[in-house]
Design a protein with these regions (language model features):
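Membrane-embedded helix boundary and interhelical linker motif in transport proteins
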Residues: 31-86, 133-134, 239, 266
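Short loop segments and helix-boundary regions at transmembrane helix junctions
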Residues: 32-37, 78-121, 212-215, 227-248
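Helix-loop-helix "hairpin" substructures at the membrane interface of multi-pass membrane proteins
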Residues: 76, 137-218, 222
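Transmembrane helix-bundle core of multi-pass membrane transporters
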Residues: 91, 95-160, 190, 214-215, ...
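Cytosolic-side transmembrane-helix boundaries in multi-pass membrane proteins
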Residues: 172-179, 183-186, 245-248, 260-306
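Transmembrane alpha-helical segments in multi-pass inner-membrane proteins
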Residues: 199-203, 209-275
Length: 306
């Protein structure tokens, strides 16, 4: 094991972590803000990349392609929202149904299981080859970091508006929100649309970065997103109390996840076990608060002092 091999691979892992960090922020919005487990992510993570690649191949600019990808993701979130709120289907099952439908949609969009986009023929915003030895303004890490800062600023502003506060209230206490006259169904649909729009945007960047879109590129995306959320909260939760900083901690969690993943690969551990390791990491971090409350919390005293 050559340590230089690991050091050379870390910038690429950081870049990939940042790209997936945008997806993780989308997962955070449904998982923590709306209190909904949205499994649409696995399908949307392919849809965004598929739309972006096909738009680029049709001659559109990279910005138009990414905007179209984001719109496609929002439509996927709209479908899940309609299944859940207006058809009464449980959120988890609604996400699975949309994810299942998106598999066929993604095949139709690309015409086959995968579609490559050549960085020499198309003007891409990010690329694997732009991680090292390029001017800083062309560096993938710098570009995606700017994206994340701008997105967090927009989300921080939005969730401070009346509509954003209604959305947060819906996730916190839907019954009280309805009593205050908030249309919780509309808020849930809107939250799912925003979340899946961010996931699709991340997918569009990932497709450019790796040079192709694949119908299976979203497999296990929800596990990666949850891992980033849980790791970010576990490490930075006691430091970052502001909403914007909490979103930033999710992006940091994604970076740490991919840095650890790269280290695991460098150590020679079988890559077939990576998904299992990811699932175990998420399970353990989710169990920690429960274990702390059950086994390590001090018993509360009842009654007055004698």
């Amino acid at each position: 094991m050559n340590i230089l091999t690991l050091i050379n691979a870390l910038p690429g892992a950081a870049a990939q972590g940042l790209i997936w960090g945008i997806m993780a922020i989308g997962v955070y919005l449904t998982f923590r803000i709306l209190d909904v487990a949205d499994l649409t992510v696995d399908g949307t993570m392919c849809t965004g990349g598929a739309v972006c690649v096909m738009m680029l191949m049709s001659g559109h600019s990279v910005w138009v392609s990414m905007l179209a990808a984001t719109g496609a993701g929002m439509l996927a979130g709209l479908a899940t929202g309609i299944f859940h709120t207006f058809m009464g289907i449980p959120a988890i099952l609604a996400g699975i149904l949309t994810q299942l439908g998106l598999y066929s949609a993604n095949l139709k969009i690309m015409g086959k299981a995968n579609q490559a986009v050549n960085g020499n023929k198309f003007d891409l915003l990010v690329s694997l080859r732009n991680v090292k030895n390029v001017p800083f303004y062309q560096n993938t890490i710098f570009i995606v970091a700017i994206f994340i800062v701008v997105l967090i600023a927009i989300l921080y502003w939005f969730f401070g508006t009346e509509l954003g506060c209604s959305l947060r209230a819906t996730g916190c206490n839907p019954n009280m929100s309805r009593a205050q006259g908030i249309n919780t169904d509309v808020c849930k649909v809107l939250g799912l649309m925003i979340s899946n729009g961010l996931v699709a945007l991340s997918s569009a960047l990932l497709a450019q970065y790796q040079g192709f879109a694949d119908v299976y590129m979203g497999r296990g995306a929800i596990v990666i997103g949850l891992a980033a959320v849980i790791i970010g909260e576990a490490i930075f939760g006691k430091i970052f109390h502001n909403f914007a900083l909490r979103l930033l901690s999710v992006a940091f969690g994604s970076i740490l996840y991919y840095l650890v993943l790269q280290t695991v690969i460098w150590m020679g551990i079988d890559t077939d076990l990576l998904k299992m390791l990811s699932a175990l990491v998420v399970a353990v971090f989710l169990a920690v608060p429960y274990w702390k409350a059950k086994y390590f919390s001090k018993p509360t005293k009842r009654g007055g002092n004698k």
